[in-house]
């Protein structure tokens, strides 16, 4: 199995599985994220349907890493940001996201509160959110904005 051209720099084939591996040492792939080290320390184990165990970031840490990525490579127009799309996906399809924050790391929660507060001040945030929702779900824009407000108000 080989990776297609244009695959992300973090994509690898491991034991015949395609995986994205994000190192917390910037010397490995040339960059890192301020949240990778903590996210790796708090990783969660999942077992795939084929019996293989994998480790993933918890949702709050995943969103924090994506927020850092948007700031680093999202540019001024987030309608085109894949990282912002990932954040919107989590906020749209994980109704318990705010509950997962209530018992989490205080530093992480404060970071998320500040970042979502800043996001809500963006002049085009409604359009940016709507552009990242699946076709036909633009009515979810207000819901997503309310989730962001809920995070800020924790």
Give the predicted meaning of each segment.
Residues 1-154:
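Compositionally biased terminal segments of proteins
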